[in-house]
Structure formats: C-alpha cells, structure tokens
Amino acid sequence: MTNKEKSNEEDIILNYLLNKHNFTYVSVLGKGGFGSVYSINVNENNFAYKIVRLHKKKGKIEEFNKAIKSIEKEFNYAKLLRGKYCIRTLSIFKDEDNKNPKIIAYSAVMENALYSDLKYFIYYFYKGNLLHLNNYKKYFKYISNLNMTTIRFFAYQIIQSLDFLENHNLCHCDFKPENFLISLGFILKISDFSLLKVVEKNKKVKLTSSTWNIKAPEYYTSTKEIKSEDAIKVDIYGFGLILYYMLTYKHLLNPEDKEKLSNKEISSEEKYEYLNKKLLDKSEEIKNFENVDQGLKNLIIECINPEISKRPNVENLLENDWVNENIDEINQVYDINDHEEIKLFIEFQKTSNKNNNKVKNRKRKKNLFFKKKYKEIQN
C-alpha cells in the first residue's frame, strides 16, 4: 500500500467513525504504524480519540487474531485503570458493521492531555523556545529551566506511576518520555498500554518487543523471561533512561548502538554483553558529570544497572533522599482534586448519551456517504 493509499484509508476510517459517533474533528495529536490519535470535541468538551486499524491478510489469519487479542487487552486494561497518574479511557468501540471485514477498527475516547507529552516539553526547554510553552507559565516559579528541581519534580511523579503499576500487578514495558502526558494540574500521566504485561505471583514474565533504545539487557537473554518480582524493574530501567534524557537531552544509546542491537546476524548473547558493557561505561561517564546533584547521578546509575536484581525496587525509589528533598513545596504545584477527573467522566457520559439521541434523529445522507466509502475499502 502506497503512502497516498494509506492516508486515504485513514481519512475514510476517521470520517466514518467520527460521523457514526457524532464526534467533531479538531486536530491530529499523533500517528503510528497501526493507528492515530486525534483531538475531538463531543459537544463542547475536548477529548483524545485513538483509532487502531487491523488488516486481515491472506495466509496471516493467526497473526490477525493475535493482533485483535492484543488490542482488546490494551483497550480493556486502559479502561479499567483508574489512577491519578494514568490517562483515563472513557469509552471503547469496535466497528462490527461488516460480518467478515477486511479491516477492523478499534477506537477509544480518552482524557486529553492539556499540554503535551514529556518529550515535547523537554525539547522546547533545550531549544529555548518557551513561546510554545505559554500554558506552563503558572509553573515557571518552579520550572524556569530544566534544572535539578525540575527533574525532581517529574521524577517524583514517575515514581508514583511505578508504584501504581506495581500495586496493580502490571508492568508497562514501554517507559519513555513520549508515553508520559502532561495533564490537569501539571500531572504526568502514563499512556499507551500496548505492551502491558500482567504479573502473576511465582510465574515468569515473558518480555515482548519494545523500542530498541529502551530495551533493558534482559530483553536479550535467550528466554526473554524474568521473575515476577523483578518485572517492575524493567520499567525502573526505563525510568533511569528518562532521567538521563532529561539531564542531557540525549538518548543513552545512539544510532551506532542501533546497528549492533538490531543486527539479526548477531546473537542475543553478544547483544546482551554489548549492552551490559555500554551501560557500565555510561555509568562511569555519569559519575563525572559536573553541576549535577550527586543524588541524581547515583539514582540514574542504580536504575540502569545491567543486573536486574541490583536495580532499586519501587519502595527504594519512594524513599530516595534526593527525590524527596523539598518535595512538599513541589507537591503544592501540581496538586489536583479528584473531583476534576470525576467531572470529566460525567461530562463525557452526558454528551455521549445526547449524541446517541442525535444520531437516531439527524439526517442520514452524510452518514450513508461515509458508510458507503467505508464498505468500499472493506472489499
């Protein structure tokens, strides 16, 4: 499929689903290989709308069914998770207009991060272009540049999300700056549960593929399996990489490392040894960073330890002296009452119910046009 055909297909699916549910398109928030996220309005309320499309291909029915299970697991868990540090999923949909569709579209209405993701935020700080960050100005008393206080401000919240995941027996497996969205009250909220793992006591956790530059060494072991009690330490490794990125505006691994770690001709054992050495070398480099709190340097080095058993656990992070320094003052900045999120949920339910009535009563000409186009790409 050419890029033009792919774009045309995306537009047809988007218009069909927006019209079907009576949502109003606002803008594109992000696009990936299998789906996209849009900003939409439901009456006067703004939400994020994620659409994932799956294609049924000849001879690959098993892969297709596996992908369906994966998407349904992601969406269902996202809807169940209710925490201060998780993006809230309000409603999920599965398009089933055709009995034997070539394409299945899953979509979810989610809380929209009001500002951006953490990677975007860091980008504009390092570029010095704060004009793009006007929404953050009320926080500039504490966040005037990406200094130790700023990094501590974010580190504290990411640790809270780690605590939330562990308490729910979950491992996110994709900890990176772009998966942390900045929402109401300047709260960092974790998103994208596509690689989520459920951790069962005394059962090993099998790791699935992740972004190459955030894969922990245990991804390169022969079995790719870890003990249940160590599962959260995969995310703690990712936390260490996020701290390093905030401090340097660089990923710990570079394109040269990608050539080595992505090379199919190199064995997993060789990749494992290569990454271990790289992490030990980087740890020595971090020790020599100037104008950086010793506590932060120690924290990064501990989190990126090649040996999973030697990384700190969540309890260690919650009690970390550097993280908790002056935390009461920082806490005042992003404190938010739970009623704001409850209000968001109620507003969506109200507007969703109103829309259901509108769909039944409105003129159907436009709806039939998009439905016809949608059926064309199914054949």
Where are the language model's segments positioned?
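Conserved short submotifs of the Hanks-type protein kinase catalytic core
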Residues: 101-117
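Catalytic-loop of the protein kinase fold
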Residues: 166-182
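Protein kinase glycine-rich loop
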Residues: 26-32, 37
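Activation segment signature within eukaryotic-like protein kinase domains
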Residues: 154-155
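Conserved HxN/HPN-centered segment at the entrance to the catalytic loop
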Residues: 82-92
